[in-house]
Regions:
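Ferredoxin-like iron-sulfur electron-transfer modules
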Residues: 2-26, 34-54, 72-78, 184-206, ...
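A short, flexible N-terminal coil/short beta segment enriched in small residues
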Residues: 41-43, 60-96, 247-278
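Conserved mixed alpha/beta catalytic, RNA-binding, or beta-rich assembly cores of soluble enzyme
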Residues: 84-139, 144, 270-311, 315-316, ...
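Cofactor-cradling patches in redox/metallo enzymes
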Residues: 122-176, 299-374
């Protein structure tokens, strides 16, 4: 981990360059987690890394560019755009665009060819991390249309990310208007919701017991479940705990994940990783590279969405090991997801796997993007253990 941190020049994934910081304290006001504060003794802005959840709202807000951020900084995003000549740039939050199929439907695109030729697409953990300079460069300098797809403000996984983006968009529209420029900036908000099939419901109330928002409840007479879609955050926990498969989550449907596992198993994969898309950023952008190592990563909306049946299927079909990557409980973006993964998924799995002497082939790891190298470290450690078990 020290080598990785030294390579990037970060102790963690974020730091403040005090040499250019003006201590305007805009970052302090913008931070949703009270992770940045002004130190009266040192007269510097300081990041409390334990509170920080790597939303990068501070990075996008800083007028002096004094906050250095490891993931998706302005330069790396602009470099990515240079590789595409598509006339439209789409930047979407991972939280509401789970798949290319979903993105095509949202954009009204009929084929992958049409999508790739007309749109350059980028999925970010939160669109609120975009700096205003990016939008100015894309619209004015490059003459492209920008489509921004944040979550609805009340459903932002980073609390104020969507709000921060909309403030920038409103500011830029006013400036462009005063300059007589007609910018092509379109905002399409959205949020994932579960799909409920009442004809399958057993009325067992598992969904009600595990739902972190109170959106799922059992009503009488029936009994049958009912969902308040106004407060559903699309974590998918109810889909994982439902024994009748009466609930599904768009983009992460049970059958689609099952089909993906079957496809992966035919490629002689050593290790399958179910990775919460909020607890690791870099690896989810380099999934293809991992395949060369015999590792396949399936991004998940939350670690709580991991279904024990999918884990058992992976082992049954010949995959040597399964790893679940989750946020630390206190940092879960969906309230109870990490706890569900640990106490529901793992406990149920251990009951079955211990009978088959396979419990050592499934592991759960808690990490965060702020801890540089931890994901790779845990992955390689488990892969080594799997190879040793296979050898004996």
């Amino acid at each position: 981990m020290d080598a990785v941190a030294s390579l990037w020049g970060y102790e963690y994934g974020i730091e403040v360059n005090s040499d250019i910081c003006a201590t305007c304290r805009m970052c302090e006001k913008a931070c949703p987690f009270n992770a940045i504060s002004y130190n009266e003794k040192t007269e510097r802005m300081e990041v409390d890394i334990e509170r920080c959840q790597m939303c990068a709202v501070c990075y996008s807000t800083c007028p002096a560019s004094a906050i250095q951020y490891l993931y998706y900084d302005l330069a790396s995003i602009e470099n990515s755009i240079e590789l595409s000549s598509a006339p439209m740039i789409v930047v979407a939050c991972r939280g509401n665009v789970p798949s290319e199929e979903n993105l095509m439907r949202r954009l009204g695109v009929r084929s992958e060819e049409e999508l790739h030729s007309n749109y350059f697409t980028m999925l970010l953990p939160c669109v609120g991390r975009l700096r205003a300079e990016f939008i100015i460069d894309a619209v004015v300098s490059r003459g492209r249309k920008v489509v921004l797809m944040p979550c609805e403000e009340d459903f932002c996984r980073f609390v104020r990310g969507s709000e921060a983006l909309m403030k920038k968009v409103q500011m830029l529209r006013r400036i462009f208007s005063e300059l007589g420029i007609s910018p092509e900036i379109e905002v399409r908000r959205g949020v994932l919701k579960v799909e409920f099939k009442p004809y399958r419901c057993l009325g067992c109330a598992e969904c009600q017991a595990f739902c972190p928002t109170g959106a799922a409840r059992v009503i009488h007479p029936g009994p049958v479940a009912d969902f308040d879609m106004d407060i559903c955050k699309g974590c998918g926990i109810c889909a994982a705990v439902c024994p009748a498969h009466a609930v599904d989550l768009k983009g992460w449907e049970f059958d689609k994940i099952s089909a993906k596992i079957h496809e992966i198993s035919e490629k002689k994969v050593k290790l399958l990783v179910f990775c919460c898309q909020w607890c690791e950023f870099g690896a989810l952008d380099r999934i293809a590279e991992r395949r060369e190592e015999g590792i396949e990563i399936i991004p998940m909306p939350c670690s709580g969405r991991v279904d024990p049946l999918h884990v058992i299927q992976a082992l049954y079909e010949g995959i040597k090991g399964v790893m679940i990557i989750a946020c630390p409980e206190e940092e879960c973006k969906l309230d109870e997801g990490s706890k569900t993964a640990l106490y529901f998924t793992m406990e149920r799995l251990n009951e079955t796997l211990s009978q088959l002497n396979l419990e050592k082939r499934v592991r759960i790891c808690f990490t965060s993007p702020k801890y540089i190298g931890r994901f790779d470290e845990e992955l390689q450690k488990f892969l080594k253990d799997i190879e040793e078990m296979s050898a004996t």
